[in-house]
Amino acid sequence: MMSGVMLLMLAIFLIIAFTLMYLAIYFEFDETTFTKRLQVMTEYVKRTNADEPTPDVIGYVSDIMQNTYIVTWFNTVDLSTYHESVHDDRIEIFDFLNQKFQPVDRIVHDRVRANDENPNEFILSGDKADVTMKCPAYFNFDYAQLKCVPVPPCDNKSAGLYPMDERLLDTLVLNQHLDKDYSTNAHLYHPTFYLRCFANGAHAVEECPDNYTFDAETGQCKVNELCENRPDGYILSYFPSNLLVNQFMQCVNGRHVVGECPANKIFDRNLMSCVEAHPCAFNGAGHTYITADIGDTQYFKCLNNNESQLITCINRIRNSDNQYECSGDSRCIDLPNGTGQHVFKHVDDDISYNSGQLVCDNFEVISDIECDQSNVFENALFMDKFRLNMQFPTEVFDGTACVPATADNVNFLRSTFAIENIPNHYGIDMQTSMLGTTEMVKQLVSKDLSLNNDAIFAQWLLYARDKDAIGLNPFTGEPIDCFGDNLYDVFDARRANICNDSGTSVLKTLNFGDGEFLNVLSSTLTGKDEDYRQFCAISYENGQKIVENEHFQRRILTNILQSDVCADLYTTLYQKYTTLNSKYTTTPLQYNHTLVKRPKNIEIYGANTRLKNATIPKNAATIPPVFNPFENQPNNRQNDSILPLFNPFQTTDAVWYSEPGGDDDHWVVAPPTAPPPPPEPEPEPEPEPEPEPELPSPLILDNKDLFYSCHYSVPFFKLTSCHAENDVIIDALNELRNNVKVDADCELAKDLSHVLNAYAYVGNGIGCRSAYDGDAIVVKKEAVPSHVYANLNTQSNDGVKYNRWLHVKNGQYMACPEELYDNNEFKCNIESDKLYYLDNLQEDSIV
């Protein structure tokens, strides 16, 4: 008994296990799927196995649902599913042979194209040859939509009224596109429906009024015959819109004709008879009528029973109450009969383009397309200060619609256009110094992401200096000599023109030589600086580098001369802090040229100088004569001649020598050399000895550094760094810097003391300047500020920092060379052996 139960349970278990295994295998892998994948792999192998081995995984399109399709990837070893993914055929297409997805644009471009010879056809590129496909009748292929679309009803038709045939009724009234032959009834038209085509290709289906039939030959609605079976003289209650106030319609010989009342009578449409009265007498205010002596666009409107007003319209129509009224749009008045299209065109000095289109029908506006003409460069600022003086639109009209404006659909009338710079602190107008080229605009609107807009702007500029001109006419691009009362080029500031008040002729041409520069704030355009040698001149030939070189610095190492600020300051300091050994008194304030190099053009004669070593000692027993005629003279042994004591033709070296505390300036003359010995045999060449190091300069004041801050080729500021090569002066500088005197109102600007003659406007009408007053370095409040600035942080009126040696932080002001300035600690690491002096070349020279 137990054995039978066990056998039954075992049988049930086996049946369940077999069923589960079967279902698992069935759902996991059915025979149909196996067959499909086997066919897919077989097809793939046949077409590709000659080129490459069978891959481990193959994908194929397994399901399609409208635009969505599924790509199934399976293992080629056992045909089991590897992966599935969902895709959109509007975005990408699966390439079976290459086992890759390709963008739709590329597929369409490669596989589908329109047939230029027949708009009803399109061409498919097959694997072996092209295949021409046809759209249904009255359909054309639209490549943009990649499908066949109905031919517009007004295709190739001018504006006007057209009869409705069977095909038009099917498509426009019944809204059905049937693929059938309409040639059998091609001559039949609907009696009252007609097609109105507009100038822009649009259409409308309209119907004639009651008692009217559309005449296909004339293209107008004509009234039906109203006098059929009516006697002659029968007056009709039919009043066409062009019927005058004294006219009526009557029947004659079975046809309706216009009848007319006797003179001085009107036809009363209420009484249906001619009466002798004013047209307004029976109808009152608001009644309208027309007479033979007014125009086609005019009518009379009754003000009361005996007065009327003449109304002039753009277009006269009659409303549903049989009263005249005005209609139409004034914009259509220039079109013939108020019907047609007008393409608007924008033209200025630089470009021209179509900006829109107006379509009218019977003086009514059907379509008014206005493209977006807002300037794409309206808010564009190049290099933070330049604007294009050109109105380049956002959109243009291409004949059918507004499209984005490009270099291809905008016509350039000139090769150059004006460039404007935003207002600046110095009032510099650069529109005559450079012009933009049309290639710049083409590059800017092409949306080339490989270059930024500033780089494109700088690359396509035309400079006045390129044409060897002081300026270019912003409107014609031709060289000019005047543009207002003066003309200069900030990119080539070697010259300038001063013109008459009308700006028509040159009064004076300035060529700036050594010691002169262009001062844009001066009426004379000339500034003076003895050290300046056109150091700010731009040497670049690359146009892009020229405009990018807005702010730069020139450094020049030169000598301290007796006439410059270094000599004045250091001489004063030296004489103040130097004392005589015997009396410990301050040396007299006398400048004697002992501190600096002798100017090149000052001659020193031997009779007025004494050698330091020739000074007579106080304890000398005897005083030797300056010149002893009996002293043994050197002679020339070769010719037994006596050499002169002074030979003006003798070659000698002289050193201009000076020493602190000396009595005067001295020439130290090298003693005459003996005659050269007889030539000896040339010795063997020896290695060249190393050059001896240069001896240090014997001068206390030797070198100075000049730093010019340039705005393009115009110098704005000059920083002089005076080298101190004497311990007395170095100690004096340190003492002065440790004992700076500051006015109370200039406490915020106390750090101007690092650089003499530095100026800062601290607001509230207070201007502070650093100076050396002969006793101490002071930061003093000026009685009247030299300059007042709107922006205290930049010390300018346009928010641009021009003075690179003046620093502002948290309301405090400091003058310091850039390389010595510590912005984090607001500190100037000033050098103990240098004195700095700042010149504002543009502003201070005109104060």
Swiss-Prot record:
Q: In which compartments does the protein localize?
A: Virion
Which residue spans match zinc fingers labelled C2HC BV-type? 148-197
- A single Pfam family it belongs to is CBM_14
Residue positions with a glycan: 156, 211, 306, 337, 500, 592, 613, 639
- Where does the UniProt annotation place the signal sequence? 1-19
Instruction: Give the highest taxon in the source lineage.
Output: Viruses
The GO cellular component terms are: extracellular region; virion component
Q: Which GO terms describe its molecular function?
A: chitin binding; zinc ion binding
Q: What keywords were assigned to this record? A: Chitin-binding, Disulfide bond, Glycoprotein, Metal-binding, Repeat, Signal, Virion, Zinc, Zinc-finger
Renumbered residue ranges of the record's region Disordered = 665-698
Q: Which residues form the Chitin-binding type-2 domain?
A: 224-282
Record-annotated disulphide pairs: 208-221, 261-274
Which stretches does UniProt call biased (Acidic residues)? 681-693
**Database matches in SMART domains:** ChtBD2
Report the protein's function.
Plays an essential role in nucleocapsid assembly. Essential for the establishment of efficient per os infection.
| Protein name, as recorded | Capsid-associated protein AC83
